[in-house]
Amino acid sequence: MNIDGYTRLAAVVAKPIKHSISPFIHNLAFKETGVNGVYVAWEIPEEDLAVTLENIKRYDMFGINLSMPYKQAVIPYLDSLTDSARLIGAVNTVIHQDGLLIGHNTDGIGFFKSLEKLRGFQVRNKRLTILGGGGASTAIIAQATLDGAKEITIFCRQQSLERTQASLTPIARATGVPMQILALDDSQLLQEHITNSDLLVNGTSVGMDGYSQPVPSTIRFPENLLVADVIYQPFETPLLKLAQSQGNPTINGLGMLLFQAAEAFQSWTGQEMPTDLIWDQLVQKYDIK
């Protein structure tokens, strides 16, 4: 990588963020496409968010990615939002375009692109069961409605039902996609919906510890159900292991990370990220079987 006076900057902004895989992905993309850019990780306190956004314009940056806790906090500092960001109510990508800062959300786009590219799954006219109603789930649900999902059922903890209904009801109303929000502790109802689904998604952090299970181990998966987990460390979560033991196809969150990055990269540079090459590098780097 040759850095000179014309090199433009992009960054991921969060707290914490030093563990991020994003610099590896984007800097490899800059190298392979020949775009004169460099991508870094900025761990900043919340009081520095406003000046960080000002610096995107000041230093003519491509833009930034955002992770927690700044996906909602950034919105007041932006000039406009894309349809997906407005529907989700959160931003993970800021695009610097013609002196304006545009908030975009590529999480849901990246998730379904990973399912399409890596597992041949198309969400149109499919029934989905989603575990959790937090940020990752909301992005996936919103994108599923935009992409033509037939029906979506969300299971969340009893104490989160009211908050989840408040955040997801506007999405259901705006898109007209049938949506139910139910308590996760009703295992019989959970089994019924999983049995009638084409896709099951764990949008929670349950399983990140390597042993916690977001569904009862007695759950039976229908033969052709695709089971997805937004977690990518560990690469095989307890949910994915349970699905594999029943012969179901599975996918973790690493593909989502790659393809949401690809959407951001194209928004900034106008160039397609070489995702096949970068996926091969990720497989090698993290010894993915």
Curated annotation (Swiss-Prot):
GO MF term list: NADP binding; shikimate 3-dehydrogenase (NADP+) activity
Keyword field: Amino-acid biosynthesis, Aromatic amino acid biosynthesis, NADP, Oxidoreductase
Protein residues bound to NADP(+): D83, G132, G133, G134, G135, A136, V230, G253
GO biological process assignments: amino acid biosynthetic process; aromatic amino acid family biosynthetic process; chorismate biosynthetic process; shikimate metabolic process
Family: Belongs to the shikimate dehydrogenase family.
Function in brief: Involved in the biosynthesis of the chorismate, which leads to the biosynthesis of aromatic amino acids. Catalyzes the reversible NADPH linked reduction of 3-dehydroshikimate (DHSA) to yield shikimate (SA).
Name of the protein described by the UniProt record: Shikimate dehydrogenase (NADP(+))
